[in-house]
Amino acid sequence: MVMMKKLLSNRLFNMSKTASQSLMNCRTSSSSSLAMRTRVPKDIGEATIDPEPGDLTISQRFLNKFSMNGIDTTSKMSIGESLMEKLKEMDMNKDRIRLDGLSHPKEETLGLTVQDVKKLLRAAEIEVIKTKLMETGKIWIRYSDFLGVCSDSSLDPSQGALIAKMLDDSGNVIVMGNSVCLRPHQLTKSIEGLLPLSQIHNPNDPRRKELNELEAIKTVIDQKAHSLVRRELWAGLGYLIIQTAGFMRLTFWDLTWDVMEPICFYVSSVYFMAGYTFFLKTSREPSFQGFYQSRFEAKQRKLMQSEDFDVGRYDELKKLFNPKPSGAVPKILGSLQN
């Protein structure tokens, strides 16, 4: 019996020692404070019974494990709920068009590039310069004056020589030495008569024979018209002679000068009005030469109509085989010599 009591007391002592060590090694201060409160009685007279050390340790471990499991479960639940919400949002938004993620299509700009703007400005400058050159009313000007117009009308005066060269290369003007032709079309028409063409000088060309026939017919018509006009002129001269003789008779024999003076004045006024009317109708000087040309053309037209003469065909063939240079040719030759 004594031995059994000693063994029992040793086991209890070892158990209490182990419990105290576990209490000292506990990580939470709350458990240690709780153990101290259970071991220390509130009142001195109150008897307390110490709990079993093993039971306290087991309960503390269970509480710690429960608290950790609760925290893990809560965190797992929160993570799972957030994941489910994300999945639901993705499922709800899978059929929706995300406008914020779409990029706007590139609009096709129809604007002008820098090169296009430069071309338009250069074309506008050239048109302004051409207008100013035409406003001068001249056919030929000096190259220095031409260069001055190009420089003054350009946005950049230093580009005047370049614009002048562009006008010359494009054929808008023709630069010949120190002279510039502002109307190249007139120059080309004038030089056409100076350029020999092999086709024109072909003696077997049937058009040349046709021209010769028309010229023969026209020569006959011109002779007839000339003779008719000459008759009219002789008749006019005879009329003036008779009128002058009649006025002399009335002035010196039948009537007096006082009577014939106003009559001669009014007759002269009638002749003046007739000459003025002739000028208005024909735009020619009221002279004998002008009257002759007017009457000759009138008679010539009548005879051509009566002979069925093709004036258009005759003018075309004459221009082709016998071109006449215009009056600008001497000016051109003079400018080339200078």
Curated annotation (Swiss-Prot):
Residues bound to Ca(2+) are 261
TM region positions:
233-253, 263-280
Kindly list the places in or outside the cell where this protein is found, as annotated in its UniProt entry: Mitochondrion inner membrane
Membrane topology, record value:
Multi-pass membrane protein
The UniProt record lists the keyword Mitochondrion:
yes
Keywords recorded for this protein, A-Z: Calcium, Calcium channel, Calcium transport, Ion channel, Ion transport, Membrane, Metal-binding, Mitochondrion, Mitochondrion inner membrane, Transit peptide, Transmembrane, Transmembrane helix, Transport
InterPro entries named in the record? MCU_C (IPR006769), MCU_fam (IPR039055)
Q: Which reaction does it catalyse?
A: Ca(2+)(in) = Ca(2+)(out)
- Asked whether the keyword Transit peptide is assigned, the reply is yes
Q: Name one GO biological process term.
A: mitochondrial calcium ion homeostasis
- What's a GO cellular component annotated to this UniProt protein? mitochondrion
Q: What is its main location?
A: mitochondrion
**Gene Ontology MF terms in the entry:** calcium channel activity; metal ion binding
The source's domain of life comes to Eukaryota
- The stretch annotated as transit peptide is 1-36
Where along the sequence does the record place the motif called Selectivity filter?
257-265
Please describe what this protein does: Mitochondrial inner membrane calcium uniporter that mediates calcium uptake into mitochondria. Constitutes a pore-forming and calcium-conducting subunit. Mitochondrial calcium homeostasis plays key roles in cellular physiology and regulates cell bioenergetics, cytoplasmic calcium signals and activation of cell death pathways.
Which family does the entry's similarity section mention?
Belongs to the MCU (TC 1.A.77) family.
Quote the protein name from its UniProt record. Calcium uniporter protein 4, mitochondrial
What is the source species?
Arabidopsis thaliana
Encoding gene, per UniProt annotation: MCU4
